[in-house]
Amino acid sequence: EILDIQEIAFNFLEIAKVRFPDELVSRYGDLDMSLKGHEILEEICIKKAWVQAGGIADHSRGASHVLDDFQQGRLGRITLEIPPEI
């Protein structure tokens, strides 16, 4: 099965907006955390000028950058794993 990078980024942003919103804001500027993941990605794309002809947000490029920022630690030392309760 082929994974859709945009769908992964949408889901990542859904988790990130709840678990580490400050890190997202620090990296991408003020974001409306009440939005859904795909809308947050749209907002990030517009802010970073990751747009296609006509000013349409380039979700593919934005998704790649957001996931790369997470993987490379540019969002900080964060993890998606939830520690077990003691």
Annotated model-derived regions:
Residues E1-I86:
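Helix-rich effector regions associated with P-loop NTPase G domains
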